[in-house]
Every structure is written in structure tokens, then in C-alpha cells.
């Protein structure tokens, strides 16, 4: 088994001619959302993919094998629901409402300017049709949004954020009021004694 532990997002920085010559790996979203899986490439090689946890593999990404060879990922067609606005009974804004309701249900969604795509679900399909949307069952590649905090399959790393250093705050003075009846569990530092200047006048002779 040929092991793979590196991914270059969309083949960034690689010569297009080399990417074109690379073997291919056609897999659907169910596999590509996993960071570890086994698969066969177009050359019949058994691949063991071990990527950092949370990595999403996208169509167009390039995997680098341990022997230095490249494998270009193709998003395989799969059954999906294609959702479009109904020109007769609705408006394009209905897609925005649909994306909102699907997002509240944490449904993976592929967003396009004129349509949405989700994995097959007859309950959601009925809900969307009730919202005056057109729902079609098709076989297409599925590339849902990865989320704002997803690793997203980036082929680079980000430097760690600097740790903020808290400003030193002097401790508040400890004042005992007349109603303060708690016991001392600490010592007070001795207060410095300020010198007091005493003026001495010469004594005048006493005359009778």
C-alpha cells in the first residue's frame, strides 16, 4: 500500500503539465470528507491516505505519495438534490431562505449563485417544495461548504497567534473599616518612619 500524508490544495504552486500527467483518484463526498481512507487510483495502486484530522479533500486537490508521485483528486458524481427557485410561484430570495433553514439543521450544502445542492433526504425535499422551490434528483459532484472554522484541506500552515501578555496590575490597598471583623491571615510590611525636623532656638538670658 502506498501511503499519502500530504495534500496540496488545488495543486497550488505545481506545474500544470505535471498535474495533468498525474494519476487520478475519483471519490465521492462520503470519502472525501474523511481524513483517513483507503482507495485505488487510476493506475490500480492501493493508496492509504492519512491526512491531518479535519482535512477535507476537494476535487482538484493533489495528493503527494511517500514515493513523491502525485495523485489528482476528482470529485465523483453522486446522487444529490438540486434546488432552484420556482419562477412561477416564488423568487430567487427563496434560495436564501432555504439555505438558512437547511443551515439551522446542520445540513451540508453546496452553494451556487442560482441553486443549492444537498444529499438526498425526502423529508427535506418535501419541506423545500412547500417553500415553493423546485427540487430535482440528479447525479453530480458534491462540494458542500466546509464551515468558517474548517481546516478546508489547506496545503499550508498558519503561524500560531501571539499569546497576549497581561499588564501588571498593582494589588488594591487592603483597608480595614470599623465593621471589618475578619482575621488577618497575612502580614503588613512595616511602614517607613519619616524623620521630623525640630527647630531649636537659642535660649535668651533671663533678667530680673
From Swiss-Prot:
Matching InterPro entries: UreE, UreE_C_dom, UreE_N, UreE_N_sf
BP-aspect Gene Ontology terms: protein folding; protein-containing complex assembly; urea metabolic process
Cellular component annotations (GO), alphabetically ordered: cytoplasm
Gene3D superfamilies in the record: Urease metallochaperone UreE, N-terminal domain (2.60.260.20), UreE, C-terminal domain (3.30.70.790)
Top-level division of the source organism's lineage: Bacteria
Gene Ontology molecular function: nickel cation binding; unfolded protein binding
Chain segments carrying region Disordered: 145-165
Coiled coil: none
Keyword terms, alphabetized: Chaperone, Cytoplasm, Nickel, Nickel insertion
Main location: cytoplasm
Pfam family, one: UreE_C
Cellular compartment(s): Cytoplasm
Family from the record: Belongs to the UreE family.
NCBIfam families (UniProt xref): PRK13261.1-1 (NF009751), PRK13263.1 (NF009762)
Stated role: Involved in urease metallocenter assembly. Binds nickel. Probably functions as a nickel donor during metallocenter assembly.
Name this polypeptide is given: Urease accessory protein UreE
Species per Swiss-Prot/TrEMBL record: Polaromonas naphthalenivorans (strain CJ2)
Amino acid at each position: 500500500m502506498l501511503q499519502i500524508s500530504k495534500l496540496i490544495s488545488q495543486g497550488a504552486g505545481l506545474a500544470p503539465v505535471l498535474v495533468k500527467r498525474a494519476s487520478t483518484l475519483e471519490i465521492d463526498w462520503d470519502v472525501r470528507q474523511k481524513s483517513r481512507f483507503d482507495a485505488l487510483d487510476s493506475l490500480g495502486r492501493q493508496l492509504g491516505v492519512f491526512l491531518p484530522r479535519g482535512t477535507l479533500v476537494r476535487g482538484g486537490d493533489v495528493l503527494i505519495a511517500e514515493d513523491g508521485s502525485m495523485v489528482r483528486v476528482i470529485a465523483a458524481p453522486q446522487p444529490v438534490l438540486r434546488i432552484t427557485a420556482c419562477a412561477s410561484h416564488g423568487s430567487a430570495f427563496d434560495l436564501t431562505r432555504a439555505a438558512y433553514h437547511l443551515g439551522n439543521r446542520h445540513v451540508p450544502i453546496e452553494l451556487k449563485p442560482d441553486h443549492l445542492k444537498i444529499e438526498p433526504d425526502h423529508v427535506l425535499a418535501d419541506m423545500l417544495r412547500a417553500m415553493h422551490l423546485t427540487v430535482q434528483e440528479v447525479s453530480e459532484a458534491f462540494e458542500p461548504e466546509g464551515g468558517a472554522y474548517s481546516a478546508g484541506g489547506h496545503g499550508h500552515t498558519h503561524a500560531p497567534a501571539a499569546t497576549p501578555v497581561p499588564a501588571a496590575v498593582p494589588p488594591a490597598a487592603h483597608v480595614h473599616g470599623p465593621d471589618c471583623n475578619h482575621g488577618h491571615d497575612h502580614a503588613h510590611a512595616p511602614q517607613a518612619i519619616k524623620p521630623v525636623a525640630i527647630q531649636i532656638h537659642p535660649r535668651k538670658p533671663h533678667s530680673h
